[in-house]
Amino acid sequence: MEKLTKQAEEIMAERFGKDNVIALATVENGIPYVRSVNAFYDNKAFYIITHALSNKIRQIKGNPIVAISGEWFAAHGKGINLGYFGKAENSEIAEKLRVAFASWIDNGHNNFNDENTCILCIRLTDGLLLSHGTRYAIDFSD
Protein backbone atom coordinates (compact mmCIF):
# COMPACT_ATOMS: atom_id res chain seq x y z
CA MET A 1 0.00 0.00 0.00
CA GLU A 2 1.33 3.43 -0.86
CA LYS A 3 0.38 7.00 -0.05
CA LEU A 4 -2.15 8.70 -2.32
CA THR A 5 -0.29 9.51 -5.54
CA LYS A 6 -1.03 12.45 -7.81
CA GLN A 7 -2.35 10.07 -10.48
CA ALA A 8 -4.67 8.24 -8.07
CA GLU A 9 -5.92 11.58 -6.64
CA GLU A 10 -6.72 12.79 -10.16
CA ILE A 11 -8.75 9.63 -10.81
CA MET A 12 -10.55 10.01 -7.48
CA ALA A 13 -11.38 13.67 -8.16
CA GLU A 14 -12.57 12.97 -11.71
CA ARG A 15 -14.64 9.94 -10.76
CA PHE A 16 -16.06 11.05 -7.41
CA GLY A 17 -15.76 14.86 -7.33
CA LYS A 18 -19.43 15.11 -8.30
CA ASP A 19 -22.73 13.52 -7.23
CA ASN A 20 -22.22 9.77 -6.82
CA VAL A 21 -24.15 6.94 -5.26
CA ILE A 22 -21.92 4.81 -3.05
CA ALA A 23 -22.60 2.00 -0.60
CA LEU A 24 -21.95 2.99 3.02
CA ALA A 25 -21.55 0.18 5.56
CA THR A 26 -21.70 0.57 9.33
CA VAL A 27 -21.74 -1.93 12.20
CA GLU A 28 -23.91 -1.91 15.32
CA ASN A 29 -23.88 -4.67 17.94
CA GLY A 30 -21.86 -6.85 15.59
CA ILE A 31 -24.47 -6.58 12.81
CA PRO A 32 -23.45 -4.93 9.51
CA TYR A 33 -25.77 -2.41 7.85
CA VAL A 34 -25.34 -1.07 4.33
CA ARG A 35 -27.21 1.57 2.39
CA SER A 36 -26.79 3.62 -0.77
CA VAL A 37 -26.05 7.32 -0.25
CA ASN A 38 -25.34 10.30 -2.45
CA ALA A 39 -21.76 11.35 -1.82
CA PHE A 40 -19.20 13.89 -3.01
CA TYR A 41 -15.40 13.37 -2.82
CA ASP A 42 -13.00 16.14 -1.84
CA ASN A 43 -9.50 15.95 -0.37
CA LYS A 44 -9.38 12.35 0.93
CA ALA A 45 -12.98 12.34 2.16
CA PHE A 46 -16.54 11.72 1.04
CA TYR A 47 -19.31 14.06 2.19
CA ILE A 48 -22.96 13.09 2.61
CA ILE A 49 -26.02 15.14 3.60
CA THR A 50 -28.10 13.24 6.14
CA HIS A 51 -30.13 13.64 9.32
CA ALA A 52 -28.57 13.63 12.79
CA LEU A 53 -31.26 11.23 14.08
CA SER A 54 -30.76 8.69 11.27
CA ASN A 55 -29.68 5.11 11.90
CA LYS A 56 -26.38 5.71 10.11
CA ILE A 57 -25.42 8.59 12.42
CA ARG A 58 -26.42 6.60 15.52
CA GLN A 59 -24.38 3.63 14.31
CA ILE A 60 -21.36 5.79 13.49
CA LYS A 61 -21.55 7.46 16.91
CA GLY A 62 -21.21 3.99 18.47
CA ASN A 63 -18.54 2.79 16.01
CA PRO A 64 -17.03 5.39 13.66
CA ILE A 65 -15.19 2.86 11.47
CA VAL A 66 -17.08 2.46 8.17
CA ALA A 67 -16.61 0.91 4.74
CA ILE A 68 -17.67 2.33 1.39
CA SER A 69 -17.84 1.01 -2.15
CA GLY A 70 -18.66 2.48 -5.51
CA GLU A 71 -17.54 2.51 -9.14
CA TRP A 72 -14.45 0.30 -8.88
CA PHE A 73 -13.40 1.72 -5.52
CA ALA A 74 -13.67 0.28 -2.01
CA ALA A 75 -12.33 1.81 1.18
CA HIS A 76 -12.39 2.12 4.94
CA GLY A 77 -12.75 5.37 6.77
CA LYS A 78 -13.83 7.16 9.89
CA GLY A 79 -17.31 8.68 9.99
CA ILE A 80 -17.47 12.18 11.48
CA ASN A 81 -20.70 14.12 11.99
CA LEU A 82 -19.75 17.71 11.09
CA GLY A 83 -23.04 18.97 12.49
CA TYR A 84 -25.67 21.26 11.06
CA PHE A 85 -25.42 21.90 7.31
CA GLY A 86 -25.99 25.62 7.91
CA LYS A 87 -23.23 26.09 10.51
CA ALA A 88 -20.71 28.79 9.59
CA GLU A 89 -17.86 26.28 9.95
CA ASN A 90 -19.50 24.10 7.28
CA SER A 91 -20.05 26.89 4.73
CA GLU A 92 -17.18 25.90 2.39
CA ILE A 93 -18.10 22.22 2.11
CA ALA A 94 -21.84 23.05 2.14
CA GLU A 95 -21.36 25.23 -0.95
CA LYS A 96 -19.46 22.42 -2.71
CA LEU A 97 -22.31 20.04 -1.84
CA ARG A 98 -24.89 22.52 -3.18
CA VAL A 99 -23.03 22.55 -6.51
CA ALA A 100 -22.45 18.78 -6.67
CA PHE A 101 -26.02 17.93 -5.67
CA ALA A 102 -27.67 20.82 -7.58
CA SER A 103 -30.02 18.54 -9.54
CA TRP A 104 -31.84 17.40 -6.38
CA ILE A 105 -30.67 19.28 -3.28
CA ASP A 106 -33.70 21.58 -3.13
CA ASN A 107 -36.36 19.04 -4.19
CA GLY A 108 -37.93 18.99 -0.72
CA HIS A 109 -36.09 15.95 0.63
CA ASN A 110 -33.80 18.13 2.77
CA ASN A 111 -35.01 20.63 5.35
CA PHE A 112 -32.18 23.12 5.74
CA ASN A 113 -34.05 24.93 8.53
CA ASP A 114 -33.82 21.75 10.63
CA GLU A 115 -30.60 21.80 12.66
CA ASN A 116 -30.57 17.99 12.46
CA THR A 117 -29.82 18.24 8.74
CA CYS A 118 -26.12 17.53 8.94
CA ILE A 119 -23.02 16.75 6.94
CA LEU A 120 -21.42 13.36 7.41
CA CYS A 121 -17.72 13.25 6.53
CA ILE A 122 -16.12 9.90 5.74
CA ARG A 123 -12.41 10.57 6.25
CA LEU A 124 -10.70 7.81 4.23
CA THR A 125 -7.98 5.68 5.83
CA ASP A 126 -7.23 3.07 3.16
CA GLY A 127 -8.72 1.96 -0.11
CA LEU A 128 -8.44 0.09 -3.37
CA LEU A 129 -9.01 1.97 -6.64
CA LEU A 130 -9.14 0.23 -10.02
CA SER A 131 -8.72 2.18 -13.26
CA HIS A 132 -8.01 0.89 -16.78
CA GLY A 133 -6.29 -2.25 -15.57
CA THR A 134 -4.25 -0.51 -12.87
CA ARG A 135 -4.71 -1.32 -9.20
CA TYR A 136 -4.02 1.43 -6.66
CA ALA A 137 -3.81 0.25 -3.04
CA ILE A 138 -3.95 3.58 -1.22
CA ASP A 139 -2.97 4.69 2.28
CA PHE A 140 -4.96 7.92 2.77
CA SER A 141 -3.39 8.77 6.14
CA ASP A 142 -1.34 11.96 6.42
Regions found by a protein language model. Give the residues of each.
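Extreme N-terminal tail/first-helix region
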Residues: M1-K18
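Charged, gly/pro-rich active-site loop segments
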Residues: E2-K3, A74-D142
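A short, Trp-centered hydrophobic/proline-enriched beta-strand micro-motif
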Residues: E14-E28, I65-S69
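Short, conserved, surface-exposed binding loops centered on an aromatic residue
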Residues: E14-F16, I31, N38-F40, Q59
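Short beta-strand-initiation
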Residues: D19, P32-R35, N63, E115-T117
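Short strand-coil-strand connectors
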Residues: N29, S69-F73, H132
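Hydrophobic residues embedded in beta-strands of well-ordered beta-sheets
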Residues: P32, F46-Y47, G127
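A short mixed-secondary-structure module that forms the rim of ligand-binding clefts
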Residues: A39-F73
